[in-house]
């Protein structure tokens, strides 16, 4: 898996820089929530404001060719995302990862330094995910409506307080 990560990291993570970049200690930021809640949209906005590499769960699944959404498959995906995120952080990058991370067990496998819960919909696009999803007890920031530009600014402010 280590070789796979080294070969694939460069095509799965990308940089977007802006004039609003803040200085902070290296962080792995997890943006989690139900499918269709706005995780990817928020991640795309936030990565414009923070010098970071971005990991999208769907892209990682595509490269791994692993479309198993069972509980075991989701744990495997969380571990895979964890491996990518840690490698990128160890290379000196902030990391923004967006994925469902539906269960406490999956969340324990992912080493987030800062967790954003995107809680904008009552149910997602997939019944099996809705049934499996457990609302997180622990998070650093709670997004309650779909306005990625506004929420990314609020998250940036919160992150700058916790530098």
Question: Model regions: which residues?
Answer:
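Conserved lysine of the Walker
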Residues: 39
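Conserved substrate/cofactor phosphate-moiety recognition/catalytic segment
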Residues: 43-83
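Hydrophobic anchor at the beta1->P-loop junction of P-loop NTPases
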Residues: 31
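Small-molecule kinase domains that catalyze NTP-dependent phosphoryl transfer to phosphate-bearing small molecules
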Residues: 109, 118-163
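Glycine-rich phosphate-binding loop used to anchor ATP phosphates in small-molecule kinases
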Residues: 72-123
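The conserved Walker
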Residues: 35
